[in-house]
């Protein structure tokens, strides 16, 4: 009888381990909506700033995908249809959550590049649970100037902040050092 119990315990232990392993291996899925530009400088709508804003989504997807997150694509036409105007999805977590939930994402990030000055801008984002529309965190990352390297650094910082609220698996790349020769 003792041997039967030992075998049963081993079997239950193996099943538990398998179920636990499946839970650990499940990827956290996140949808990242297109970032919108809130340019309140004296010369809004500069093509370079529009291009920079458009590049943020792809950079952030690359950082999070490299860390092991599953990136879910939301149909652009569906995103435009759900967006009632500038700032609508950013201010309506429930609508953004429903949009990403239909695409199969666990979470959605709604982002904005807020540019109050030519000297700096703020990368802003709302991380939302798609199953209930609950706001997990509101992020703000400052970036100086419009240089692509500085924008990427801000995106890396944003990815790190998002990851701290989710799986804590992201490791940002080390800073690039340049050697000065005499």
Q: What do the predicted segments below correspond to?
A:
Residues 2-12:
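Bacterial N-terminal signal peptides that target proteins for export
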Residues 20-22:
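N-terminal signal peptide c-region/cleavage motif recognized by signal peptidases
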Residues 26-40, 58-59, 63-70, 98-102, ...:
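C-terminal/domain-edge helix-coil "capping" segments
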Residues 41-51, 83-87:
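Second-shell loop/turn segments in exported
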Residues 51-57:
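Well-ordered, non-membrane alpha-helical segments in soluble/globular domains
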Residues 67-110:
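Short, solvent-exposed, polar/charged sequence segments at loop or secondary-structure edges
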């Amino acid at each position: 009888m003792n041997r039967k119990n030992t075998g049963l315990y081993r079997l239950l232990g193996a099943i538990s381990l398998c179920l636990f392993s499946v839970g650990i291996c499940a990827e956290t899925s996140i949808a990242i909506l297109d970032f919108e530009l809130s340019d309140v400088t004296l010369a809004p709508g500069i093509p370079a700033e529009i291009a920079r804003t458009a590049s943020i989504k792809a950079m952030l997807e690359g950082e999070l995908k490299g860390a092991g997150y599953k990136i879910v694509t939301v149909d652009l036409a569906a995103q435009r249809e759900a967006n009632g105007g500038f700032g609508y999805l950013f201010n309506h977590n429930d609508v953004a959550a429903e949009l990403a939930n239909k695409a199969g994402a666990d979470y959605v990030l709604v982002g904005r590049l807020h540019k109050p000055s030519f000297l700096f801008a703020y990368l802003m984002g709302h991380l939302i649970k798609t199953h209930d529309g609950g706001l997990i965190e509101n992020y703000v990352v400052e970036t100086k100037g419009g240089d692509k390297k500085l924008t990427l650094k801000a995106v890396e910082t944003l990815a790190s902040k998002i990851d701290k609220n989710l799986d804590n698996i992201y490791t940002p790349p080390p800073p690039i050092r340049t050697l000065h020769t005499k």
